């Protein structure tokens, strides 16, 4: 039994992969030590996507055509998961993401699964928390380069607006380095809180 693991072992978001990779390796070692599944041992094929969507697609295609994996664990981040989820569905290869929260990763796909909550769940919960804290206005600072950030921002904005909060929106991209002008704009509108739905 071959299981492919597609994850960012290196790059900007590699810290998210450590727990996933080590967790998979630990469980596979445990299963194999107990005799495998129906007497068959599990072989892991682990590849580094570097957190890049196109690299994840290339790895997925190789794992299916050359490595002949039976299951994919990954991707870790939403953008790369979105890039391979449709491929998994078409190939009818089960894919499980431990941490991709974008709703569209699994939507309408019966071969794609997640073991975590979704962007709407997080965004709504955060907006409700802002209401509980009795904030009247919140600035949302969104990284438009990230599917994760955009999904969370939209869910937060929808719920916070329903709850009567005033929303101030500012956007940036992953390449931005100077936030002085954006933060000056936000400061000028005097929000009671700032919501930054992004990777740390």
Regions found by a protein language model. Give the residues of each.
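An alpha-beta-alpha
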Residues: 112-174, 193
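Beta-alpha junction/loop-to-helix N-cap segments that form part of ligand/metal-binding clefts
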Residues: 15-22, 34-106, 115, 174-179, ...
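Short, well-ordered amphipathic alpha-helical segments that serve as non-catalytic structural scaffolds
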Residues: 23-31
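Short beta-strand segments enriched in small/hydrophobic residues
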Residues: 1-19, 75-76, 137-143
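Second-shell loop/turn segments in exported
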Residues: 9-15, 46-49, 69-71, 110-116, ...
